[in-house]
């Protein structure tokens, strides 16, 4: 009760109002379970009784502004136990974030000592050092291809690769710059000869860092950090900023292109999975419809989902035909891989077993080359002029194939195949010419005139045309 009185004294309320508006036991649950709110709630935004502005963490969905209560301020724990951040994503963004002890339920403010600041600064320095080293390596590989020393630019001097960063320097330049560093006259643009004349100490063959004595370009050496920064400025000034950053930009563009291509590939794979999922659903629904209306149903369903799925990934071929074509002609419901915009426009045949069902669907019987429903598919391709044979050199062969495929019956006689085979020697280049879907005139001849065991030359329109025009007996 004392806690309630304290709460409503802060809010400017009396004892009677306090008894009528008691807080819910949500706060205790919050401090014991370690609930992490998405955003801290500021008291001024929700209370109208003059409570001072103070950031208080509450559970969003159970908070009721009408009850006019606030969270009591808790003291810091004497012995901190296992801590958990109230807002883990923002724990390092400032010193005013709170953390809660899951054992005691107490909260404490986050503070940073000087050791944390020192570690952070060292981490940033190392990151900056790696960036400088990478830029110098990029300059050496793309611009300074002659192998000369990056300091004196003498091609004939003996260059030594530093063991740490892999840059090319000669012993003279490394030693002279070390002397300048000790003399606190670190001028990278000053000629090296002046230092060599005034100093009689010999040049070491093995380059060592003149500051720390370790291998040159030690990661913890301050001399190497200053040296690389000034060296990068000199490289940019000598070769020109434009040339240096062009090489740098090319490297960045290559990484960006690689990242974009990776994202496209991932998006393509995801779209392919979604497309297959939609196709399987369409396939299951179409299986419950009569075969006569199945083709039109599938075509309409595909159009409905065309804006939701990238169908450009569905370009796989199966026996040289699209499975969606096969479905539209009532040939099956498996392996849907491609979307066609145009409706099929096949001509009705006189054969009673191959009549149009009214939806442009011509069922291909099981006896017509089992597993390959090519005749109807090839007829559709001819109507759309998807084959290059119409622009071939020989018009006679084109006329023969065109006449065969334009016959009303989707099946013909395989006895006509020898006639085309006789012309292979004369028109072999035309017979083997493929279009973008993998068809050739030879394929047209082979699968486009398959015989139907229920038809003969007298009752089938296609058989009659073959017999009269080309003297072929069905």
From Swiss-Prot:
Gene3D superfamilies, alphabetized: Zinc/RING finger domain, C3HC4 (zinc finger) (3.30.40.10)
InterPro entries noted in UniProt: Znf_RING/FYVE/PHD (IPR013083)
Domain of life: Viruses
Protein name: Uncharacterized protein ORF124
Originating species: Ostreid herpesvirus 1 (isolate France) (OsHV-1)
Organism lineage string: Viruses, Duplodnaviria, Heunggongvirae, Peploviricota, Herviviricetes
